[in-house]
A protein has these predicted regions:
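N-terminal non-catalytic structural scaffold regions of very large proteins
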Residues: 1-232
């Protein structure tokens, strides 16, 4: 039933954030319960970091410094000379295929990172929101795709470090990231409300009722107390 379908990320938004889980655990030790107003759901950044490895890149005078990972470059032909970010020396010629063995040899010789220009970053996605420290202005949200316009804004803002999602479109796809972009919800309350509307169409939406439905669907021990042959 298409009317009952929701983006899977709506469920993730509805789950407790790591901060909330830690707070609940600490209060439990003290025999206390968390105030509902203190509960937060998973954020977009938290969801992305759960499903993707994060690559850190740093802006230097001659380009962006990217970590060299031998396991990721098997069969890769870089369209540019591979330049060691520490020595500025060419360590591998462009359009020459790398093997796991040759990549490991480069590491054994001391290669830790290499230099790339802005073009290399086009099409990659931010793991965290970009905020200008002095003004607090958010110039891009987590999950945003890097393009020429955004890279120009990043360079003009003198942002020197970026955290990017590792997506190679072979072993790791952009599916969760794309689903987050399509999800109209942005926080726990909105997500719980959407789930409630699907399960109880026409009924008035309240946070308490939405939480009750969500817990019943996914966390009711009696509902999911299955025997070895299923529910009896």
């Amino acid at each position: 039933d298409r009317r009952r379908k929701l983006p899977v990320t709506t469920i993730f938004y509805s789950l407790y954030s790591k901060e909330t889980e830690e707070k609940i655990a600490e209060l439990k030790k003290q025999g206390k319960r968390i105030d509902p107003s203190e509960i937060t759901g998973m954020s977009k950044e938290e969801i992305l970091s759960y499903f993707y490895d994060i690559d850190h890149v740093e802006k230097l005078k001659k380009g962006w410094k990217v970590a060299f990972e031998p396991a990721r470059v098997k069969g890769v032909k870089f369209p540019f000379d591979l330049v060691d970010a520490d020595t500025n020396k060419v360590v591998w010629e462009k359009d020459k295929k790398l093997t796991v063995r040759s990549a490991q040899k480069l590491v054994d010789k001391g290669l830790k990172s290499f230099l790339v220009d802005d073009n290399y970053l086009y099409g990659k996605f931010l793991a965290k929101a970009l905020v200008i420290a002095k003004t607090g202005e958010v110039i891009a949200d987590a999950g945003a795709e890097l393009n020429e316009e955004l890279l120009t804004a990043i360079n003009e803002a003198k942002i020197k470090e970026l955290d990017l999602l590792y997506i190679d479109n072979v072993n790791v796809g952009p599916y969760i990231r794309n689903t987050l972009e399509a999800d109209r919800n942005t926080n726990r309350e909105e997500a719980l409300g959407d789930i409630f509307k699907v399960m109880r169409p026409g009924e008035p939406v309240t946070l308490e009722a939405s939480e009750a439905i969500f817990k019943m669907l996914f966390f009711d021990e009696e509902r999911y107390d299955l025997s070895s042959v299923g529910r009896v």
